[in-house]
Amino acid sequence: VEGIFAYWRWILVVLTQLVFYGLPWFEWGTRQAVLFDLASRRFYIFGLVLYPQDFIYLTGLLVISALALFLFTAVAGRLWCGYACPQTVYSEIFLWIERKVEGDRSARMRLDDADFSLEKLVKKWYKHIIWIFLSIWTGFTFVGYFTPIRELAMEFFLTQMSSWELFWVFFYAFATYGNAGFMREQVCKYMCPYARFQSAMFDNDTLIVTYDAERGEPRGPRSKKAEVGGLNLGACVDCTLCVQVCPTGIDIRDGLQYECIGCGACADVCDTVMDKMGYARGLVRYSTQNAMDNKWTPAQIWQRLMRPRIQIYTMILVAVTVGLLVSLSLRTPFKVDVVRDRSTLSRITEYGTLENVYRLQIMNAAENAQTYRLSVKGLPGLKITTDTEVMVDPAQARWIVLRADVPYGSVEGGSHKIMFEIQALGTDEFVVEKSVFIVPR
């Protein structure tokens, strides 16, 4: 299929795959630029290092993704499905390989119906070998987001990969090979939950792929010299090409169906037929239900697209996105946890002071080693008696034992709130953590 929508679909195929296959090979300093290190419980995203305590940012990203999906669906239906969904992307790639090896649809049908021969065997095996190679490469790249990909490549060629790495490479490869090579539209029609609930986000002003029945009916074949209406026929020549090119095999002339992924392939092929017949394009096109009923112009359609529902979705999406970005910009590049030593509530030292013991963890999320200064306040005479400066390696965490005391008898018995202040030397960044100081009654 050739046309404007096929062109944009392939643009997105190329862009998404350049990002997917290329991103793990980029380096940021001495490490991989994007790495989800589950073993060390750290996510590296260029200059950003995230820990389990930063789960709120992942939640925010998921909320943004969901809101974007709602917005795109309300504006133009299953835009994601038709142009950027991995199932669509890899099905397009596998179909392209199939066409290059076996020929167009007619040639593939003839090959399937032909008796067994060396040519048939070679073409089938050649196609599947390319599919399998691409699938394994895809699985390898996927695992490369969780294991440093350069180390993974060395282990792969030296056959030293761990059993779990091998499992996930071939599991993802098998899923790619099966879904894109064989299941294809069955995934969209029966397995994908989005197909079932996406209609709840549609309304009569949502852009969808439509068939202009008033112009196209009654349909029927005719010669190229026949004029529209001359044979009491509409513009549709009943060539069924729109059905043949549809990834899910539906007939758009029967109206919108939940299987439609909004890819526009039927619109492209119909425009090609209209050009050959000398008819106006747009028998199958992106439009809205209200536009079809009221014969709106493109300007009226675009004006109606910015309806209140879309404006609300957009404002919420922008607000959440800005909130997440502001939160990330204000995020301190280190985190602190203070835990009281449960083995001893308090004790009197040889110097006649009352001491409490704490365990303090400092997580340095920066890309360079950092020294931190510790201080405590909240009670008269309260001071730290252990080292007050701690150095932590880049992207590492360190536990230390911290002791604090007050002069004996200077504070009444009970549990007193105190605050530990941890400052990164050479910067204005600091963290304050609350705790308690126990004084026996």
For every predicted segment, state its role:
Residues 383-409:
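Intrinsically disordered, low-complexity Pro/Gly/Ser/Thr-rich segments with frequent PxxP/GP/PP motifs
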